[in-house]
């Protein structure tokens, strides 16, 4: 499946998840959080996936964190149950 804000590469038991918003230093906004939540849901369900590496595109930053510019521009702020980047509250993910 293709994603708008991330690139997924699968190599045997490894997933490489590349944040893909280099124009915003890979800062995460609500749509990206939702997308990453889906990605990590799929990673968790995949019995052949053992390890995920999260990296960022571009040469300025891995990730600037929360996209404050999106928020200041009035972007809709929503959270996902699995936490920031679809990952920080995912206590049941033991890969």
Give the location of each predicted region.
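Conserved CoA-thioester-binding segment of acyl-CoA-metabolizing enzymes
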Residues: 1-59
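Short N-terminal binding/cap micro-motifs at the start of the first secondary-structure element
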Residues: 25, 61, 92-95
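Generic detector of intrinsically disordered, low-complexity, polar/charged segments
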Residues: 53-55, 61-62, 80-83
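Phosphate-coordinating loops and pocket residues in cytosolic domains that bind phosphorylated ligands
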Residues: 27-30, 64, 73
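Glycine-rich loop at the start of a catalytic domain that most often binds anionic cofactors/ligands
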Residues: 59, 63-69
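An acidic, glycine-rich surface segment that forms the CoA-thioester-binding/catalytic face
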Residues: 37, 41, 68-95
């Amino acid at each position: 499946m293709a994603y708008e804000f991330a690139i997924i590469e699968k190599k045997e038991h490894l997933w490489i998840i590349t944040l893909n918003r280099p124009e915003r230093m890979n800062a995460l906004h609500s749509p990206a959080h939702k997308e990453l939540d889906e990605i990590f849901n799929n990673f968790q369900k995949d019995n052949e996936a053992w390890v995920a590496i999260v990296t960022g595109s571009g040469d300025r930053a891995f990730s600037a964190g929360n996209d404050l510019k999106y928020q200041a521009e009035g972007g809709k702020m929503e959270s996902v149950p699995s936490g920031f980047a679809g990952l920080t509250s995912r206590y049941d993910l033991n890969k």
